[in-house]
């Protein structure tokens, strides 16, 4: 990543998020992964994944992230049970009391309660909450746009919904890009094109270069296995980077989809694809 242009001016690294197998790691493994990433990142800010079903564990993760020198922790609503917004708010509040590390609140509405407009208003009262990783259900009420437009002056919004031209126009300044794991230059180009206001080109680049990745991801989920990061890791292997399979229960896709993924990368003009 660093060798191909990623730096403190254009990126924040996420250590131990969903694509990083956080849900299958022990507490000790999560801390070790974050420690290694922080050491290797140098001046690049690091967010440590702190998603958990346990508030007590979140408190420990917050303290460890602060000790390690992480810039942020990523916090989502506890899953499995259908927790209320008040449950989630108290969960966040406990983390804020545990340490001074910054917090990115991740709206994982597909596994837990969705963060409402009212909840975002309440989050403005917690100083450590500096970012929202944002995706929403979609309706005529334009929930995604409503929150970004209303709160872009108070939070750094990370677009996790692939609505990059729209979100940037409304004030979002960060963008969740899986392609950067194997093609960091693509994310750098995205930022430059957005900042230039060339939204037509951004959308064309997304359709021509990013969509094939996400389309294959969706296909794999529909016909073979589910999870996160499985295609990221295969693509990393295909451009010569050390990687692995996802931990079970997500099944290993590498041999089954290797050739299809390779063709996708070549068709998208991804650099460094090997033999």
Predicted regions and their residues:
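Active-site beta->alpha loop and helix N-cap motifs at the rims of alpha/beta catalytic domains
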Residues: 1-114, 251
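C-terminal alpha-helical cap/extension of soluble enzyme domains
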Residues: 3-10, 179, 183-275
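Structural recognition of alpha->loop->beta junctions
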Residues: 6, 66-73, 98-101, 120-131, ...
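Conserved active-site and cofactor/substrate-binding residues in soluble primary-metabolism enzymes
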Residues: 28, 32, 86, 90, ...
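Alpha-helical scaffold segments in soluble metabolic enzymes
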Residues: 36, 94, 122, 189, ...
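A generic secondary-structure micro-motif detector
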Residues: 51, 153-154, 222
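Catalytic alpha/beta core domains of metabolic enzymes, predominantly
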Residues: 109-218
């Amino acid at each position: 990543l660093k060798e191909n242009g990623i730096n403190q001016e254009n990126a924040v690294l996420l250590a131990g998020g969903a694509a990083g197998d956080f849900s299958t790691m022990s507490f000790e493994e999560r801390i070790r992964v974050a420690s290694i990433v922080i050491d290797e990142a140098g001046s690049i800010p690091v967010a440590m994944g702190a998603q958990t079903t346990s508030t007590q564990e979140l408190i420990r993760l917050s303290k460890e992230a602060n000790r390690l020198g992480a810039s942020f922790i990523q916090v989502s609503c506890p899953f499995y049970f259908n927790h209320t917004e008040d449950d989630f708010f108290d969960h966040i509040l406990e983390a804020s009391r545990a340490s001074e590390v910054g917090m990115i609140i991740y709206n994982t509405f597909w596994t837990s309660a969705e963060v409402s407009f009212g909840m975002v208003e309440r989050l403005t009262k917690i100083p450590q909450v500096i970012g929202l990783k944002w995706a929403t259900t979609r309706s005529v009420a334009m929930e995604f746009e409503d929150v970004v437009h209303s709160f872009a002056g108070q939070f750094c919004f990370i677009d996790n919904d692939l609505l990059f031209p729209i979100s940037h126009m409304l004030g979002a300044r960060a963008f969740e890009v899986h392609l950067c794991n194997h093609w960091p230059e693509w994310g750098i180009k995205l930022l430059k094109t957005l900042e230039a206001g060339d939204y037509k080109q951004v959308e064309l680049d997304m359709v021509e270069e990013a969509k094939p990745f996400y389309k294959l991801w969706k296909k794999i989920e529909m016909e073979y296995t589910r999870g996160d990061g499985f295609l990221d890791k295969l693509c990393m292997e295909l451009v010569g980077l050390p990687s692995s399979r996802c931990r079970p229960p997500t099944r290993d896709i590498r041999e089954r989809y290797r050739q299809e993924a390779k063709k996708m990368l070549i068709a998208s003009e991804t650099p460094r694809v090997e033999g």
